[in-house]
């Protein structure tokens, strides 16, 4: 498939670049969602102090790691 050229000689990002960008955006959105919802779930079960911070970080990584591949697959379908 030929690469499209923009109006000023700029080429479009490749399919792999789009998939990477989707993965990074999905991880960022998932981690932000984990930062918003993580404290509520951790406080609800009674975590405090260092355990609370670890639980929030774990929730952020889990939600980012879950949403990132879905966004990457979505961007791959659009290629």
Curated annotation (Swiss-Prot):
Record's signal peptide: none
Any one GO BP annotation for this protein: cellular response to reactive oxygen species
Region Sufficient for antibacterial activity, residue ranges: 42-60
Transmembrane annotation, as ranges: 22-44
GO cellular component term, pick one: TIM23 mitochondrial import inner membrane translocase complex
Keyword Manganese assigned: no
Its membrane topology: Single-pass membrane protein
SMART domains: Romo1
Cell location: Mitochondrion inner membrane
Keyword set, alphabetical order: Antibiotic, Antimicrobial, Membrane, Mitochondrion, Mitochondrion inner membrane, Transmembrane, Transmembrane helix
Keyword S-adenosyl-L-methionine: no
Annotated family: Belongs to the MGR2 family.
Protein purpose: Has antibacterial activity against a variety of bacteria including S.aureus, P.aeruginosa and M.tuberculosis. Acts by inducing bacterial membrane breakage. Induces production of reactive oxygen species (ROS) which are necessary for cell proliferation. May play a role in inducing oxidative DNA damage and replicative senescence. May play a role in the coordination of mitochondrial morphology and cell proliferation.
UniProt protein name: Reactive oxygen species modulator 1
Gene: ROMO1
